[in-house]
Structure formats: C-alpha cells, structure tokens
C-alpha cells in the first residue's frame, strides 16, 4: 500500500468536493479547480474525508495511487489557502516593475521583458527586486514562477539572475591568475 495514497484527505469547512466518474471538482473560498484522474482509481467522499483506493497491486496502479491522492490534497489546499512562490532578483540594474496587469523585467538584455500572467495567476511586485506569484493551482503557480526564472537563471560565478527565495545557488570559483 502506498504510504501517501492510503492517508485520507481531510476536507476543511467551506470546501466542497464532488466526484463524477473520474472527474474531481473542488470548490472553496478562493475558487474552483477541476481535474480528471485515472478511471481505475476509486475516489470516495465520506463526510469530511476523501479516500483514494486502487483496484489491485499492479505496478501501473501502484504508481498513480499516491500521485492521485497528492494532487487532490493540493487542489483542496489551493482552493482553501492558495499557493505562493517568491522570486528574488539579484544583479546590478536588474529590476522588476508592475505596469497594469503585466510585469516588466529589466535583466541586462538590450530590451525589457514583458510578461502577462495567465488567467487565475496573480503576480505582485512588492519591491523592485522581488516577485510573488500567487494562485490556487500549485502546478500553474510553479510553472509561471519557473517561466519567469528562466528569463535569467542565476549564474554560478556572481550569482546574478532570478532565483527562488529559498534557492541556494552553488557558486564557482573564478579563474586563478598567473
């Protein structure tokens, strides 16, 4: 039995979960998420708990058992509390600013980079060297944060670039002179 898969997902007050065939819809104070799962997984809602069971111990079913439970738990967490990723910008002249719905990044290129977040994702710029990505879908928040980071990944010599706030950049030593 999967250690993660056999744990029930506790549904907090104010969150409703509906299961139709293999489609799970989670509604909460922050919004609504819908996702289709593998039809072999049995998803049951009993009171304020949701359980995921697999039909047998075949390898294909074992691999998606814990994943299905984790995805549903993230959906419940997202509509209840939401998710956020913080990015830090380091480097001389590197900065971000918000203009209306989009953010403009000056990252040492000959042109500024403009990024408009997708529907359901909110991007804040509290200081010109910090970006906060918020949303109800953990997957989409992580994707947008990774996309913004990819515009200028931290380089190993001086550490300049966009990094996650909890990321540790491994530094390299420069060339040794004669």
UniProtKB/Swiss-Prot annotation:
<dbReference type="GO" id="GO:0003735">
    <property type="term" value="F:structural constituent of ribosome"/>
</dbReference>
<dbReference type="GO" id="GO:0002181">
    <property type="term" value="P:cytoplasmic translation"/>
</dbReference>
<comment type="subunit">
    <text>Part of the 50S ribosomal subunit.</text>
</comment>
<dbReference type="GO" id="GO:0019843">
    <property type="term" value="F:rRNA binding"/>
</dbReference>
<comment type="function">
    <text>This protein binds to the 23S rRNA, and is important in its secondary structure. It is located near the subunit interface in the base of the L7/L12 stalk, and near the tRNA binding site of the peptidyltransferase center.</text>
</comment>
<dbReference type="InterPro" id="IPR000702">
    <property type="entry name" value="Ribosomal_uL6-like"/>
</dbReference>
<dbReference type="InterPro" id="IPR019906">
    <property type="entry name" value="Ribosomal_uL6_bac-type"/>
</dbReference>
<keyword id="KW-0699">rRNA-binding</keyword>
<dbReference type="InterPro" id="IPR036789">
    <property type="entry name" value="Ribosomal_uL6-like_a/b-dom_sf"/>
</dbReference>
<dbReference type="InterPro" id="IPR002358">
    <property type="entry name" value="Ribosomal_uL6_CS"/>
</dbReference>
<dbReference type="Pfam" id="PF00347">
    <property type="entry name" value="Ribosomal_L6"/>
</dbReference>
<protein>
    <recommendedName>
        <fullName>Large ribosomal subunit protein uL6</fullName>
    </recommendedName>
</protein>
<keyword id="KW-0689">Ribosomal protein</keyword>
<dbReference type="GO" id="GO:0022625">
    <property type="term" value="C:cytosolic large ribosomal subunit"/>
</dbReference>
<keyword id="KW-0687">Ribonucleoprotein</keyword>
<comment type="similarity">
    <text>Belongs to the universal ribosomal protein uL6 family.</text>
</comment>
<keyword id="KW-0694">RNA-binding</keyword>
<dbReference type="InterPro" id="IPR020040">
    <property type="entry name" value="Ribosomal_uL6_a/b-dom"/>
</dbReference>
């Amino acid at each position: 039995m999967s250690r993660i898969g056999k744990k029930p997902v506790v549904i907090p007050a104010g969150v409703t979960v509906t299961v139709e065939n293999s489609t799970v819809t989670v509604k909460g104070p922050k919004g609504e998420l819908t996702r289709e799962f593998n039809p072999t997984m049995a998803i049951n809602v009993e009171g304020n708990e949701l359980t995921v069971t697999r039909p047998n111990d075949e390898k294909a079913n074992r691999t998606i058992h814990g994943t299905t439970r984790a995805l549903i738990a993230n959906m419940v967490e997202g509509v209840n509390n939401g998710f956020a990723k913080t990015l830090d910008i380091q480097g001389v002249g590197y900065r971000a600013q918000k203009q209306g719905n989009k953010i403009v990044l000056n990252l040492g290129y000959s042109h500024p980079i403009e990024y408009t977040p997708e529907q359901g994702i909110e991007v804040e710029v509290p200081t010109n060297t910090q970006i906060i990505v918020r949303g109800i879908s953990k997957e989409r928040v992580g994707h947008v944060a990774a996309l913004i980071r990819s515009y200028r990944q931290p380089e190993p010599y001086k550490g300049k670039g966009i990094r996650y706030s909890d990321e540790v950049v491994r530094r390299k030593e420069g060339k040794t002179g004669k």
